């Protein structure tokens, strides 16, 4: 198998990278109807597998779980989760031949083995579904030509897919049909029904290509969504403690600070996040973010280049073949960091204090979001896609850190995201230590910036620069489709 993207000519690559269409609400008038009366079999019962299955069942679909024989015999976690939630569970041989739609929600590294096992069992004309296109695009999986291949990719961790559905809403979702596998022309109908069954149609659905989803998803999770939060957490904690801040206070400011800050980002973009600061603090955060963008732009560009070329995927798949030695070592190193092992702070930090004492963190968020967005757009990815992969998902990832620090984030995200996160953070931390952290001033982190006179013209220009960034325009439009967004922050 060869990397699918690299088999395309330049025109085809650009066309698939740039495929992105916001779908009208009336396109989902039938909701999940196209799949009602058909059998949906999910392979894998992790965070996405279980929570998508629960939503689909609540939407009236016939859902069962196909697990490996040994997982059933040994009553592993996947078997327990499926059975405890009242789902029918069976082996591949028992359930796959009956399925109209087989949804592969196992980890990326297992996809090839799963497809090899289920494909001979699938009936003619059935459909195969993914929630991430890595196996199709980067591995280059070849699927039988009578099988329809579709993707429904909720833009958040699996736990939030369920929580937003239970709130009566949903999460923004990308859907796609693999152009090499749509023999009956029903791929889009299947994908739309599946997306509606998870609740995604209530928050907005984008019609994508497999290529656009994979390349933008990898870039977002490696840089701003996970890598920047990990690097920022470690750098900010160490900086605070080195300057005499109580370790417990420093830990809480960072652990819950990302979530509180990005809640404003979720509701009103970078503009609202920056408006939560005093005018002197806003000017300082803007200046810091511009410095960060200049320093980190080459790192963001390198990650995008390696994603586009396939170099990132090749390196990660080599680690898969080597029993995840790099991934496991990086995971262990993260667990040993001072931030992860700091004591808990029992006092209360007010919501505004997270902003006032977190100017550097706000600058990191602004710089990371804008850089990820700009780098993706410069590479041919459409602005709407870049928005979802750089800004929209950030509060959801920050929420995982608020639960159990970096450990929780890395447990919830996929192994692919975790690997890319470490790759980015391991480069960003020394880079910023060398070129940035020693230049910080009093009030940038852990204390409020003192009140001072503000130049009106400078403030006007900064406000205009913030509001006129392209991500703010596209964000305003897309948030208009998400009028039922619920607050998720739990900080206190």
Curated annotation (Swiss-Prot):
Domain KARI N-terminal Rossmann as annotated: residue spans: 15-208
Domain KARI C-terminal knotted: 209-344, 345-485
GO molecular function annotations of the record: ketol-acid reductoisomerase activity; magnesium ion binding
Pathway: Amino-acid biosynthesis; L-isoleucine biosynthesis; L-isoleucine from 2-oxobutanoate: step 2/4; Amino-acid biosynthesis; L-valine biosynthesis; L-valine from pyruvate: step 2/4
Top EC class for this record: oxidoreductase
Gene Ontology cellular component annotations, sorted alphabetically: cytosol
Keyword check for Iron: no
Cofactor(s) required for function per UniProt: Mg(2+)
Reaction catalysis annotation: (2R)-2,3-dihydroxy-3-methylbutanoate + NADP(+) = (2S)-2-acetolactate + NADPH + H(+); (2R,3R)-2,3-dihydroxy-3-methylpentanoate + NADP(+) = (S)-2-ethyl-2-hydroxy-3-oxobutanoate + NADPH + H(+)
Sequence positions that bind substrate: 414
Keywords from the named record: Amino-acid biosynthesis, Branched-chain amino acid biosynthesis, Magnesium, Metal-binding, NADP, Oxidoreductase, Repeat
Enzyme active site: 132
Residue positions binding Mg(2+) 1: 217, 221
GO biological process: isoleucine biosynthetic process; L-valine biosynthetic process
Cofactor annotation comment: Binds 2 magnesium ions per subunit.
Protein EC: 1.1.1.86
Function: Involved in the biosynthesis of branched-chain amino acids (BCAA). Catalyzes an alkyl-migration followed by a ketol-acid reduction of (S)-2-acetolactate (S2AL) to yield (R)-2,3-dihydroxy-isovalerate. In the isomerase reaction, S2AL is rearranged via a Mg-dependent methyl migration to produce 3-hydroxy-3-methyl-2-ketobutyrate (HMKB). In the reductase reaction, this 2-ketoacid undergoes a metal-dependent reduction by NADPH to yield (R)-2,3-dihydroxy-isovalerate.
Entry similarity comment: Belongs to the ketol-acid reductoisomerase family.
PANTHER family per the UniProt record, alphabetical: KETOL-ACID REDUCTOISOMERASE, MITOCHONDRIAL (PTHR21371:SF1)
Protein name: Ketol-acid reductoisomerase (NADP(+))
């Amino acid at each position: 198998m060869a990397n699918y993207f690299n088999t395309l000519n330049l025109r085809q690559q650009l066309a698939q990278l740039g495929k992105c269409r916001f779908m009208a609400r009336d396109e989902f008038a039938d909701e999940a109807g196209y799949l009602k009366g058909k059998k949906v079999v999910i392979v894998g019962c992790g965070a996405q597998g279980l929570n998508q299955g629960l939503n689909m069942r609540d939407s009236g679909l016939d859902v069962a779980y196909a697990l490996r024989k040994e997982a059933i015999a040994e009553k592993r976690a996947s078997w327990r989760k499926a059975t405890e939630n009242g789902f029918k569970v069976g082996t591949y041989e028992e359930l796959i031949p009956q399925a109209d739609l087989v949804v592969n929600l196992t980890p990326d590294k297992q996809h090839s083995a799963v497809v090899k096992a289920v494909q001979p069992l699938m009936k003619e004309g059935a459909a195969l579904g993914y929630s991430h296109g890595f196996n199709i695009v980067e591995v280059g999986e070849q699927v039988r030509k009578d099988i329809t291949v579709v993707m429904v990719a909720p833009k958040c961790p699996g736990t939030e897919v369920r929580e937003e559905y239970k709130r009566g809403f949903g999460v923004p979702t990308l859907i796609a049909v693999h152009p090499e596998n749509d023999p009956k022309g029903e791929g889009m109908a299947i994908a739309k029904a599946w997306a509606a069954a998870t609740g995604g149609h209530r928050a907005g659905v984008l019609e994508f290509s497999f290529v656009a989803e994979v390349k933008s998803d990898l870039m977002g999770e490696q840089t701003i969504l996970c890598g920047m939060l990990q690097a920022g957490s470690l750098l900010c904690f160490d900086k605070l403690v080195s300057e005499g801040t109580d370790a417990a206070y420093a830990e809480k400011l960072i652990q819950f600070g990302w979530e509180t800050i990005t809640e404003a980002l979720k509701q009103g973009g970078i503009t609202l996040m920056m408006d939560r600061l005093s005018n002197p603090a806003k000017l300082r955060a803007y200046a810091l973010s511009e410095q960060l963008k200049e320093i980190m732009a080459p790192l963001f560009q390198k990650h995008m280049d390696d994603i586009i070329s396939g170099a990132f995927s090749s390196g990660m798949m080599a680690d898969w073949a080597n029993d995840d030695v790099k991934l496991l070592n990086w995971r262990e190193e993260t667990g040993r960091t001072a931030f992860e092992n700091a004591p808990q702070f029992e006092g209360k930090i007010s919501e505004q204090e997270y902003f006032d004492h977190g100017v550097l963190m706000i600058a990191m968020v602004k710089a990371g979001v804008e850089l990820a967005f700009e780098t993706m757009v410069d590479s041919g990815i459409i602005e709407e896609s870049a928005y979802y992969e750089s800004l929209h998902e950030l509060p959801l990832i920050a929420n995982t850190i608020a639960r159990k620090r970096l450990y929780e984030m890395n447990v919830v995200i996929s192994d692919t995201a975790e690997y890319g996160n470490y790759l980015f953070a391991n480069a960003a931390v020394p880079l910023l230590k060398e070129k940035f952290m020693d230049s910080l001033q009093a009030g940038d982190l852990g204390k409020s910036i003192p009140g001072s006179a503000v130049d009106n013209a400078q403030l006007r220009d900064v406000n205009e620069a913030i509001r006129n960034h392209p991500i703010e325009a596209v964000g305003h439009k897309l948030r208009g489709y998400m009028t039922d967004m619920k607050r998720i922050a739990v900080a206190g």
